[in-house]
Swiss-Prot record:
Name of the protein this chain belongs to: Mitochondrial thiamine pyrophosphate carrier 1
SS bond list: none
Protein's membrane topology: Multi-pass membrane protein
Family annotation (InterPro entries): Mit_carrier, Mitochondrial_sb/sol_carrier, Mt_carrier_dom_sf
Record's subcellular location: Mitochondrion inner membrane
Any one cellular-component term (Gene Ontology): mitochondrial inner membrane
GO function term, MF aspect, one: thiamine pyrophosphate transmembrane transporter activity
Transmembrane segments: 26-44, 89-105, 129-149, 183-200, 215-231, 280-297
Solcar repeats: 21-108, 123-208, 215-305
Domain of life: Eukaryota
SUPFAM superfamilies on file: Mitochondrial carrier
One GO process term, biological-process aspect: mitochondrial thiamine pyrophosphate transmembrane transport
Family designation: Belongs to the mitochondrial carrier (TC 2.A.29) family.
Length: 316
């Protein structure tokens, strides 16, 4: 049995080193995984963003549950889906690019290792870490403006909804085209690290769970949950930094000249302490772990369905 066909719960691990996934298969399955994951976790994302953006001395929200109640009471239940249009576009594009680039990088890395097998070998988990980090860089680079728009719209605490077009116009008038790239550098570092760690953790969890495949239902989702929690737990400060920079022009307590990530880090440490980087951490874990579980579960099942459909039609 080769690496690609090493299975858990009777299904192929399509993210394993050596797995054969075509670009169009990864594109379709990745888009579906992003769309479904976003639709389910949108309210948690809004709560997380509100908590992350709070500055010491202006704490409007006190914990995830009270934030939920406050938003529903003051803005209406629909407010939990503020920023959902750019976020849905973001998740669909991100999922498509992430899994397509992961598949391509995984294949290229396998070929490189094969051609240099006398010099070194790469473990399955390390392979996933490298390919995952690369896919995180690619997907973040191409979808970042939608991430920024999602943050701006979700952060709006007014009862009325901001339109995506008015937000785009406001950013452009205030900062020019460069305004859509605010926080890109910490964003690339944050997501590349988080994505690499997610795929790394997922591969380790899949390898470990082979011994328990008969007792763990929805194995892909279970392993995805562990992967999401691990990745977010290790990279959360970078995510907070990215969100703060994205909202810098609207933050009352931070000088506009402090746009550089290092300067902003110093400002947060000075005014809020180390815990300033961990605001919204609990809700972020509650959001990220299920998101990864749903995303990886949907991707694996979608690919299995696509391959089965393609196989049947080839026989006709």
């Amino acid at each position: 049995m080769n690496a690609a066909s090493d299975t858990s719960s009777g299904r192929e691990n399509h993210l394993k080193k050596g797995s054969k996934v075509s670009p169009y298969e990864a594109l379709i399955a990745g888009s579906l995984s992003g769309a479904i994951a976003r639709g389910i976790i949108a309210p948690l994302d809004t709560i997380k963003i509100r908590l992350q953006l709070q500055i010491q001395g202006y704490d409007t929200y006190k914990g995830a549950s009270k934030t939920f109640v406050s938003i529903c009471k003051n803005e209406g239940v629909k407010a939990l889906w503020k920023g959902n249009v750019p976020a849905e576009i973001l998740y669909i594009l991100y999922g498509a690019i992430q899994f397509t680039s992961y598949s391509a990088l995984s294949k290229a890395l396998s070929e490189f290792e094969k051609n240099n097998r006398n010099l070194f070998t790469i473990s399955n988990s390390t392979h996933s870490l490298i390919a995952g980090s690369g896919s995180g860089l690619a997907s973040t680079f191409f979808t970042y403006p939608f991430d920024l728009l999602r943050t701006r719209l979700a952060a709006n605490s007014e009862a009325h909804f901001l339109s995506m077009s008015s937000t785009i116009k406001s950013i452009y008038e205030m900062h020019g085209i460069g305004g859509f790239c605010k926080g890109l550098t910490p964003g690339l570092l944050s997501v590349a690290s988080s994505t690499g760690l997610m795929f790394w953790s997922y591969e380790l969890a899949r390898e470990f769970s082979n011994n328990y495949k008969d007792v763990i239902p929805f194995l892909e989702g279970f392993c995805g949950f562990i992967a999401g929690a691990t990745a977010k737990g290790l990279t959360f400060p970078l995510d907070t930094l990215r969100k703060r920079i994205q909202m810098l022009s609207k933050t009352r307590d931070i000088d506009q000249n402090s746009i550089k990530a290092i300067q902003l880090c110093k400002t947060i440490l000075k005014n809020e302490g180390i815990f300033g980087f961990y605001k919204g951490f609990s809700i972020s874990i509650l959001k990220s772990a299920p998101t990864s579980a749903i995303s990886l579960f949907t991707y694996e099942y979608s690919l299995s369905a696509i391959k089965e459909f393609t196989s049947k039609h080839k026989k006709l």
